[in-house]
Amino acid sequence: PERARRFLGKKHPLPVVPANARNVRSVVRAARGCHLLVNASPAKFNESALRAALRLRAHYLDLSANLGRNPFKAEQLGYAKRFAQKRRAAVINAGVAPGLTNLLVARSAELLDRMDTVHIRLYESTVGDTAVSQWSAEGLFDEAVSRPRVFRDGRFRLAPRFSERERFRFPAPIGAVSVVLAAQDEVATLPYHLPLRHLDVKIGGNEIDRLRRWYRQGKLRPSRGMVAARFPGTLTPRQVARLIRCGKLQNARLAVAVLAGGTRKDLPVEIRWDVSFPTLYQIRMRGLGVTPIAYATAQMAALFVRYFPRQLRGVFAPEALPAETRRQVLNAARTRGFAITRKLRQGKRSLDEEW
């Protein structure tokens, strides 16, 4: 409760109730009377939150998957029948990556007669004199020590950590950067809902470069645990503002690119989506002390809540939502400061469009 108050501020009217996220009964007591349970805790608590939502007969939404039992299938999908029996809906992985990326892949599938390949590329960077976690330290550590999941030739595989390095060009002002395979959750849902042959996710930026360097130095091993010096806790808005004022944190940036390849009218087609988000500086100018990843994830979660499909029954990844719901969320994302651009190439023809 104390940490939550530091995020919200002492005068915020939102009630803060303590709960043990590992204990289903504790979550049920804290959330009694709610209609929608939003789980923004680390993914290792997903199943406790899912069971609590079922006991409460509440709808459910979360931001990521744990993949502890099956590295290739989101554990939340196993609760589909139970949510259907309770006549409730669960929307999972409803953030930016996964979340927004899934919506863009699904939109690409609508534009193509057949979609074969999907490449998702992410960029995360900070400019400053101190190490800052743009998102959950637990999530960053889990991604750093987990083997990346890929979908190749219609089969799931585990790839070596930080492998398949390549140069990828993001729109200005980022430009060309090195990207490597990452353990992202999109691979654990997209192949189950869309006919694909190839899918991978790579990340670039100085944060992933730092993790890759530590890995090559032998400093990233699950047995060694999470070292606080390398994986600092998530900063409160007040701490972010203090670092900016002191000049220790100048800026931070997040970008997403989704490339989908397939055919339309028997011709090869490539669709590219680029999404740029408000930078740390731009967010600070709005009076908010949060990082770009935290801001973008919170905005996407809010949009999924706003357009929550209460009429559905079961568990749904973003790409499995009704087309109208997906379009509403994508259109609303643009009003939150997300610049979404689509480029379509068919043969020698190229067309640039603002979403």
Where are these regions (language model features)?
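ADP-ribose/adenylate-binding Rossmann-like module
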Residues: 42, 52-74
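Adenosine-phosphate binding glycine-rich loop
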Residues: 82, 86-125
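Short acidic/histidine-rich motifs immediately flanking catalytic phosphotransfer sites
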Residues: 11-12, 31-36, 55-56
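Rossmann-fold NAD(P)-binding glycine/threonine-rich loop
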Residues: 64-90
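C-terminal catalytic/substrate-binding lobe primarily of soluble NAD(P)-dependent oxidoreductases
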Residues: 110-355
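Conserved Rossmann-fold cofactor-binding substructure of NAD(P)-dependent oxidoreductases
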Residues: 18-36, 40, 45
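NAD(P)-binding Rossmann-fold cofactor-contacting core
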Residues: 1-7
